[in-house]
């Protein structure tokens, strides 16, 4: 995971998502959060374009044709304090692949890729096995936040390790250029550059 620059909400977001969403909530004040009307999907295509079809958590490009685009509510809809208030707010949305959204579920990881305080090099990659770990140069408190984020988002699961290792191998085997890697796998790209590979 690497920091992501938050994009400004689309001009029609208020009319397409926020207003109808909040009106629906007013009409259904006691509904279970899992049943909230998914007006956020009306901004999914624009969100994908604004974030270059790159998952906020895995930092990989994925094409919409696979049907894996999803909107994650960083603060989950089920949050007892802010869930309802943020359910239809652009600032609470993270563009991510569906699989990662399902892994996160209702967890709130300590590190948010949209947070300007998240450090660019929070995580390092061991390309021998594709594993990730906190940058050892940071203090114990920040490193623990990194570990807790890895756990909350399951960023070091076998599939993720395999993916990172595969992306690196394609670059190492000269099957893709550094520019291709930057576009398709920004986190792997960042680590290739940092490690001088």
Residue ranges and their predicted role:
Residues 51:
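Short acidic/polar micro-motifs at solvent-exposed secondary-structure junctions
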Residues 54, 70, 96:
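The −1 position to Zn-ligating cysteines in a subset of zinc-ribbon hairpins
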């Amino acid at each position: 995971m690497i920091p992501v620059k938050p994009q400004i909400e689309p001009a029609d977001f208020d009319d397409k998502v926020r207003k109808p969403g909040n009106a629906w909530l007013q009409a259904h004040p006691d509904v279970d959060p899992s049943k909230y009307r998914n007006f956020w999907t009306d901004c999914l295509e624009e969100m994908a374009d604004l974030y270059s079809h790159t998952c906020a958590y895995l930092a990989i490009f994925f094409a919409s044709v696979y049907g894996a685009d999803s909107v994650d509510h960083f603060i989950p809809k089920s949050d007892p304090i802010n869930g309802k208030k943020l359910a239809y707010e652009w600032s609470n949305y993270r563009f991510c692949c569906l699989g990662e959204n399902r892994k996160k579920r209702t967890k709130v990881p300590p590190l948010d890729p949209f947070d300007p305080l998240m450090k660019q090099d929070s995580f390092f990659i061991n390309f021998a096995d594709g594993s990730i770990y906190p940058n050892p140069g940071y203090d114990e408190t920040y490193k623990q936040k990194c570990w807790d984020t890895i756990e909350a988002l399951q960023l070091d699961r076998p599939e993720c390790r395999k993916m990172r290792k595969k992306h690196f191998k394609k670059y190492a085997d000269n099957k893709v250029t550094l520019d291709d890697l930057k576009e398709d796998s920004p986190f792997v790209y960042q680590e290739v550059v940092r490690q001088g590979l």
